[in-house]
Amino acid sequence: MCGIFYTSAPALPTIIAAARTLSKRGPDASSEQTVDGNFFAFHRLAINDLSSAGMQPFVTNKFAFVCNGEIYNSKRLRKLFNINFVSNSDCEVIPYLILKYGIVTTLSMLEGVFAFVFLDRTNNEILSARDAIGVKSLYMGTQKYTLAIASELKAL
């Protein structure tokens, strides 16, 4: 189980402290990163890719992405792309699917359990989803003009 945290707010001390309340969900490593004014945190329990390459968020010039999940058909989905993925993480394929097929089709293609946040850096748009059953929890809250999304309610 990993912990993910996102907010459209800057990385203020209170925001960082909130994100760190999820650290028990990822005992292997933690990462905090601001991308285009959006704050991402990831607490990792390494399962599929034990190397540092599997650390999130995954960030390119097109997206930033964090995910707590297990994508059972990730190897088959990776074959849809002629790119070199930076890791062996089963979640890394998801943002590429979103960019190519859109969120609705991507969700129908995924086999597994997941909760994620995707920042489209081109359109400055946030997309977030979880598996239909809700095996991987995901909570969202707003305050004024700020959006926050986390693996556990206590981080909000």
Model regions and ranges:
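Cysteine-centered catalytic environments shared across enzyme families
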Residues: 1-156
